[in-house]
Curated annotation (Swiss-Prot):
It comes from the Bacteria. Protein S19 forms a complex with S13 that binds strongly to the 16S ribosomal RNA. This is Small ribosomal subunit protein uS19. It comes from Desulforamulus reducens (strain ATCC BAA-1160 / DSM 100696 / MI-1). Keywords: Ribonucleoprotein, Ribosomal protein, RNA-binding, rRNA-binding. InterPro entries: Ribosomal_uS19, Ribosomal_uS19_bac-type, Ribosomal_uS19_CS, Ribosomal_uS19_SF. PANTHER family: RIBOSOMAL PROTEIN S19P FAMILY MEMBER, SMALL RIBOSOMAL SUBUNIT PROTEIN US19M. One of its GO terms (cellular component) is small ribosomal subunit. The keyword Ribosomal protein applies. GO terms for biological process: ribosomal small subunit assembly; translation. GO terms for molecular function: rRNA binding; structural constituent of ribosome. The keyword Ribosomal protein applies. Belongs to the universal ribosomal protein uS19 family.
């Protein structure tokens, strides 16, 4: 279910402050965040934000197409290693 329009998009205050400070200074350095729940705002375009996936921080470069999505969408938390290969044991037992 989507967030109510009357509430508006959510972003953590510390994240918004950090982005605004970097925009004022004209810096484009990578910074870490644990806030996967924050919505991507237009002020973030061009920045690289390292989003925590539960083990490490994954650098995410923010583009125009990402505005309106959540930061967590671009840092997957699970590693898919594929299905098990066919082995003799699985095919030989009948």
């Amino acid at each position: 279910m989507a967030r109510s329009l009357k509430k508006g998009p959510f972003i953590d205050d510390h994240l918004l402050k950090k982005v605004d400070e970097m925009n004022e200074k004209g810096e484009k350095k990578v910074f870490k965040t644990w806030s996967r729940r924050s919505t991507i705002f237009p002020q973030m375009i061009g920045h690289t934000i390292a989003v925590y996936d539960g083990r490490k921080h994954i650098p995410v470069y923010i583009t125009e197409d990402m505005v309106g999505h959540k930061l967590g969408e671009f840092a997957p938390t699970r590693t898919y290693r594929g299905h098990a290969d066919k082995s003799e044991r699985s095919t030989g037992l009948k």
